[in-house]
Design a protein with these regions (language model features):
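Phosphate-coordination loops involved in phosphoryl transfer and adenosine-cofactor binding
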Residues: 31-33, 101, 123
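Glycine-rich phosphate-binding loop and adjacent beta-alpha segment
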Residues: 55, 72, 111-183, 216-220
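Structural motif corresponding to alpha-helix initiation and N-cap regions
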Residues: 66, 85-90, 110, 114, ...
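N-terminal Rossmann-like NAD(P) cofactor-binding module of classical short-chain dehydrogenase/reductase
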Residues: 81, 104-105
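Short amphipathic alpha-helix with an adjacent loop that forms part of the alpha/beta core around
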Residues: 88-98
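C-terminal capping/lid region of NAD(P)-dependent oxidoreductase domains
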Residues: 176, 181-190, 198-220
């Protein structure tokens, strides 16, 4: 996009293509809806917060520390939930007067899944992007049936080149102008030369970062 340098631009495709394909394409996000984004300081998380706010949604997001909750608010989330201190499902229910949320963007899986299904509003959508906490869960499909819920999920990497190209074209048309006028910005936490790739991986595995970690060619 115009007005975005090459390092910042490197942090755009993976996370914004992924969140577009899931939150916009699969969940059909609309203005005025309410969204819960798990892992709000991850690359997927911050991209989801910023894109949802640009679409006119109310955003809840989770993180594990006070510092990360502050970052979530800086990204634009309306509600930052420290999941070590608060029950994210209760906060969402309380702040929506029991209605629940329209969309949950899940990057955790495991025992989060039944709790997320339980907090969806009528016609709500749960989209699963990653499953580090586990690929199996017990879900009350009576709720899915009675509340007309949708459970879906997808990843970018297994998609065909034409599918990825279509997603990129949609971003170019809709999201690139938001970057050009600074309505949306990227969040780069750290950059490393390729020779320090192991250090970058250690930082990522520590989960201390907020935003993207970028590997750069020497001299950039």
């Amino acid at each position: 996009p115009e007005n975005v340098d090459i390092i910042e631009a490197a942090g755009i495709p993976e996370v914004f293509c992924t969140i577009w394909a899931n939150m916009v394409d699969r969940c059909a996000l609309k203005a005025g809806e309410t969204v819960l984004i798990q892992g709000g300081t991850s690359g997927i998380g911050y991209a989801g917060i910023k894109l949802a706010k640009a679409f006119g949604a109310t955003v809840f997001a989770t993180a594990r520390t006070a510092e990360k909750c502050s970052a979530i608010r800086r990204f634009g989330a309306d509600y930052a939930i420290n999941y070590r201190e608060e029950d994210f499902a209760k906060v969402c229910h309380d702040q929506t007067t029991g209605r629940g949320v329209d969309i949950v963007v899940d990057i955790v899986g495991g025992d989060y899944l039944p709790r997320e299904v339980g907090l969806l509003a009528h016609g709500g959508r749960l989209v699963i992007i990653n499953l580090p906490a586990g690929k199996t869960a017990t879900v009350d499909f009576g709720l899915v049936h009675s509340k007309h819920l949708t459970i879906t999920g997808s990843r970018m990497r297994p998609r065909s080149i034409p599918e990825k190209a279509n997603i990129c074209r949609a971003l170019e048309k809709t999201v690139w102008p938001m970057f050009a006028n600074s309505e949306i910005t990227t969040e780069t936490y750290a950059t490393f030369p390729f020779s320090k790739a192991a250090d970058a991986h250690r930082l990522m595995e520590s989960s201390e970062h907020i935003g993207k970690i970028i590997l750069c060619s020497e001299g950039i």
